[in-house]
């Protein structure tokens, strides 16, 4: 049975046109008890800032209206996915603090003001250099940001750039990965298992299984599962793989969130 989906995008995101009604009806059909809408909030990306603007007043008002509309069928959570960079901390955290979020994902979608997906960074760095720079930036982000619950798709850097950029150099970056995970744990923050990697032809979820195992080895406890769906058909996709993996390493729960606090739910 599917428990929830804590990474879903709607028509409020610059890269989705999916209606909220279709999202909630799909989640209800799948038997989910709660779902977090986590539309994109980004700031200061070269040539793309306007695409990622999120009208937080209208967004919050709308999600809370839908929460009331569907309250007898599913628990709708007000979430957001904040694309962070070291220099945008003050602006973005001040924005997040203004609203009654249940759940906040922090993600790194851009390095040095350039969107990783657009290919500019790959022109100047090979796979090894880019992955190293990415994890150095993620470490700076987790050290400085506080207004979030989980870090999204931590090894997202492998998604773009074509075949020669695929695959995580886990051992080569383990020093940085360990510092990132230890910082998250010390701040009582979690990670997500993001199942979109199967749809991006990497045949895995983000982050890789070694990284998830390491988080728990170091004492981490907070874990969410998200589809990163931008259309309703992807909600809950490949969650059975994530559930089976967690149980195989002795983790028998995932988290929901209420007013920024984790609620642990057993995987059945």
Residue locations for each model-derived region?
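A metal-dependent hydrolase metal-coordination microenvironment
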Residues: 1-136, 234
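Divalent metal-binding pocket/active-site signature
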Residues: 17, 42-44, 99, 103-184, ...
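Hydrophobic residues within beta-strands of alpha/beta enzymes
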Residues: 35-37, 104, 151, 191, ...
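Histidine/acidic residue-rich metal-binding segments in metalloenzymes
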Residues: 55-68, 75-77, 94-99, 127-150, ...
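Generic structural "secondary-structure junction" signal
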Residues: 84-86, 118, 153-156, 207, ...
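Active-site flanking residues adjacent to catalytic metal/cofactor-binding acidic residues
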Residues: 6, 38, 80, 152-154, ...
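Residues that form or immediately flank small-molecule/cofactor binding pockets and catalytic motifs
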Residues: 81, 156, 258-261
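Charged catalytic cores and adjacent phosphate/nucleic-acid-binding surfaces used
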Residues: 1-10, 20, 112, 164-268
């Amino acid at each position: 049975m599917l428990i929830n989906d804590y990474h879903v995008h709607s028509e409020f995101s610059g890269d989705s046109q999916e209606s909220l009604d279709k999202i909630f009806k799909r989640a209800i059909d799948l038997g989910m008890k709660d779902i977090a809408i986590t539309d994109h909030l980004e700031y200061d990306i070269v040539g793309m800032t306007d695409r990622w603007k999120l009208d937080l007043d209208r967004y919050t008002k709308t999600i809370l209206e839908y929460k009331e509309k569907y309250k007898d069928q599913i628990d709708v959570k007000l979430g957001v996915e904040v694309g962070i960079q070291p220099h945008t901390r003050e602006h973005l955290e001040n924005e997040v603090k203004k609203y009654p979020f249940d759940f906040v994902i922090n993600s790194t979608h851009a390095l040095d003001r350039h969107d990783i997906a657009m290919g500019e960074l790959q022109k100047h760095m090979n796979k090894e250099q880019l992955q190293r720079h990415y994890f150095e930036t993620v470490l700076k982000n987790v050290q400085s940001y506080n207004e979030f619950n989980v870090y999204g798709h931590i090894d997202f850097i492998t998604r773009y750039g074509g075949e020669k950029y695929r695959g995580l150099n886990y051992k080569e970056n383990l020093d940085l990965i360990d510092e990132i995970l230890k910082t998250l744990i010390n701040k009582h923050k979690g990670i997500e298992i993001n199942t979109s990697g199967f749809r991006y032809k990497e045949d895995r979820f983000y982050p890789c299984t070694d990284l998830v195992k390491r988080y728990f080895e170091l004492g981490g406890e907070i874990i969410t599962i998200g589809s990163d769906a931008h259309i309703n058909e992807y909600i809950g996709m490949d969650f059975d793989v994530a559930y089976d993996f967690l149980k195989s390493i002795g983790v028998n729960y995932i988290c929901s969130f209420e007013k920024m606090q984790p609620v642990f739910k057993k995987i059945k």
